[in-house]
């Protein structure tokens, strides 16, 4: 696991906090934040219409943040999701989403693995 400096971590936490507000405005219910497993972390777990959404929040100003979600990152997310589901509710319907924060604007990309 890579350790972030405090400034970078604070920026990420601020983006996640703003992301939660945005998601709530879209009708999502926050279930959990920063779920860790031995494989990685899920930034936000939210529920909408009976479906669990595992959401990776990415922010950036000088680049397109979606490119920070690499195939390797997705594999780690999937392993972490499996851990979460095995602990909480193995029969849940779910999807993997990305929430992009750029220049103060939000874009929710649903089902990024398809």
Curated annotation (Swiss-Prot):
One of its GO terms (molecular function) is nucleic acid binding. Coiled coil: none annotated. SUPFAM superfamilies: Restriction endonuclease-like (SSF52980). Belongs to the UPF0102 family. This is UPF0102 protein HP_0823. It comes from Helicobacter pylori (strain ATCC 700392 / 26695).
């Amino acid at each position: 696991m890579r350790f972030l400096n405090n400034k970078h971590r604070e920026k990420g936490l601020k983006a996640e906090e703003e992301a939660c507000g945005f998601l709530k405005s879209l009708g999502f219910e926050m279930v959990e934040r920063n779920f860790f497993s031995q494989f990685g972390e899920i930034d936000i777990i939210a529920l909408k219409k009976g479906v669990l959404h595992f959401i990776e929040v990415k922010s950036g100003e000088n680049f397109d943040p979606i490119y920070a979600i690499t195939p390797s990152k997705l594999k780690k997310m999937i392993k972490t999701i499996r851990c979460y589901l095995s602990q909480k509710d193995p029969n849940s319907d779910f999807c993997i989403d990305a929430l992009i924060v750029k220049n103060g604007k939000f874009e929710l990309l649903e089902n990024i693995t398809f």
